[in-house]
A protein has these predicted regions:
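Short, conserved catalytic or interaction motifs in soluble domains
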Residues: 61-64, 81
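Short peripheral tails and domain-boundary helices/loops at the edges of structured domains
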Residues: 73-89, 93
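Conserved protein kinase catalytic core
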Residues: 66, 84, 110
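Conserved hydrophobic positions within beta-strands
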Residues: 12, 59, 68, 73-76
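Acidic, low-complexity mobile loops and tails
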Residues: 1-55, 88, 92-126
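Short, solvent-exposed beta-edge and connector elements
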Residues: 35-40, 62, 71-73
Length: 126
């Protein structure tokens, strides 16, 4: 993945600007590794409003359940249908086929305020 248009949160979500007002959201490889084998993902419905820093779903792994937080506010425009049958895609390809949702962003400033890759890697000690 080209990380030029990607930002990160302290909660280990990544947000990729897809052009226009759309962003894709997933979790980082660091988060996927910490969670372990992911067995189920609950996502918001298309058309649902999400609010930055609020839970928008859950990620169930063999050893834990974690909230999925919205890194930006907006409206869900797509969900990854493959995760229903293959939640393990999050572990296998967290920056690619393991994406969670696409959101039409309400305020681009929220995206701009997130960490770049260097800041995120520094936060996780890499």
């Amino acid at each position: 993945m080209d990380f030029k248009n990607v930002r990160f949160t302290k909660d280990h979500e990544w947000v990729r600007a897809d052009g226009g007002e759309e962003v894709s959201i997933g979790i980082t490889d660091f988060a996927a590794g910490e969670l372990g084998d992911i067995v189920y993902v609950e996502l918001p419905k298309v058309g649902a409003a999400v609010t930055a820093h609020q839970s928008m779903g859950t990620i169930e792994a063999v050893k834990t359940v974690a909230d999925l937080f919205a890194p930006v506010s907006g409206v869900v425009s797509a969900i990854n249908p493959a995760l229903e049958q293959h939640p393990d895609l999050v572990n296998q390809d967290p920056f690619g086929d393991g994406w969670f949702v696409r959101v039409k962003v309400k305020d681009k400033k929220e995206f701009d305020a997130l960490m770049d890759r260097a800041a995120y890697q520094s936060m996780i000690g890499k």
